[in-house]
A protein has these predicted regions:
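A helix-coil-helix interface module used to build multimeric assemblies
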Residues: 1-152
């Protein structure tokens, strides 16, 4: 994103830190579900929840070796979690994480855009009411036409 054209709230949604946090949340939720089904031990989920962390620079470093973003992420998380990390990503594919993350990011971005549209529409309504009697030159097919008003 080009900083001068980007809203900080939108940039935050797409930053690597946010992406990897969503990945960690997805992996943790998957482990929680597997623990509820008795597939993995509940203690492992507790450890993953408590110790689960990552460092973007370290993930980038690992990815230079592995040439795989998800493997790099999982390797870095395992450095924090330890032995229970073997249950992370069990039964999942990279697409499970990437596609779910993208859906979360798109939902957050859409919510931000819709909130902005609501503010824009409110401002337009205010201006339309404010200028309902302000006369201006009408236009039709790119040329001057009958007078109209800026507002409603």
């Amino acid at each position: 994103m080009i900083p001068r054209y980007s809203r900080p709230e939108m940039v935050a949604i797409w930053e690597p830190e946010s992406k990897f946090q969503i990945w960690l949340d997805i992996e943790t939720y998957a482990c929680e579900a597997q623990a509820e089904l008795g597939v993995i031990p509940a203690e492992a989920v507790d450890a993953i929840r408590e110790k689960g962390a990552f460092e973007v620079a370290r993930i980038d470093e690992i990815e230079l070796e592995t040439k795989h973003d998800v493997i790099a992420f999982l390797t870095n998380v395992a450095e924090y979690v330890g032995e229970p990390a073997r249950f992370i990503h069990q039964g999942m594919t990279s697409s499970d994480v990437l596609d779910t993350c993208l859906s979360v990011q798109l939902t957050r971005a859409t919510d931000l855009l819709l909130a902005g549209m609501d503010r824009l529409l409110a401002a337009l309504k205010t201006r339309a009411e404010e200028h309902k009697m302000t006369v201006c030159m009408g236009r039709s097919h790119g040329i001057h036409a009958e007078p109209t008003t800026f507002g409603v």
